[in-house]
Amino acid sequence: TKGKGSDNIKKLREYLSKSNELEPNVKNWASNIYDDYHSFQKGVDISKKYDPEFVSTNFNSQNLSELIKTRRSVRYFKKQSIDESILKEIFDVVNWAPNSCNRQAIKLFVKSNSSEEIKELMKLNNGATCMNVPPVFVSICFDTKGLVLPIEREVAYIDSGLGLQNLILMAHSKGIATCVLNWTHAKQSQEDSLRKKLNIDKYHLIIANMVMGYPSKGSPIPTRSNLKDFVIWR
């Protein structure tokens, strides 16, 4: 409705101009909303921007199913390093996963091509890592500055899980294996050490760690539940 929300939009603009904690992409996104609001108030037709056509794809679903079903958690890696350009291409898909309020709050802290440092990082996972030293160690974190209510903490785990799956599948498509390392058992001393080694700020919630590299061997194919065991039709 024309004129509706004008007071709130002014407050939003003031907040955006003063806030230094927002990520640039989030700040730009919110600023664009503000600009579109004023364009609408001036009579500009913005319907195409906010009511776009559904984007379809000709991607072969069988190929996608094969990619998903052939992925394995791998714990044996070659010493071969991963080119930085390939890593960037893999990491780029993380924030294309669904995420709450378009926060795009996942942060990846990456250590690569430093076997001694990676070995020390893996020790923080109490040995639940891999059988040799991989070329890349990643700590998956979530920027909590954008979370307001205590219940929103769960959002961090949901968003990070969705984004991490994107990363894992993209890596698999390039012949790079991964293994997600559980962090729920970490002691406070281990968390403090990880934060210090990777310079992770206190407002970045550590969700999980992951190792990745070119596999030197595969992993057994685990038995999967039948569809009827986990899909309940109502």
Please describe what each predicted stretch is.
Residues 1-234:
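Acidic, surface-exposed loops and disordered segments
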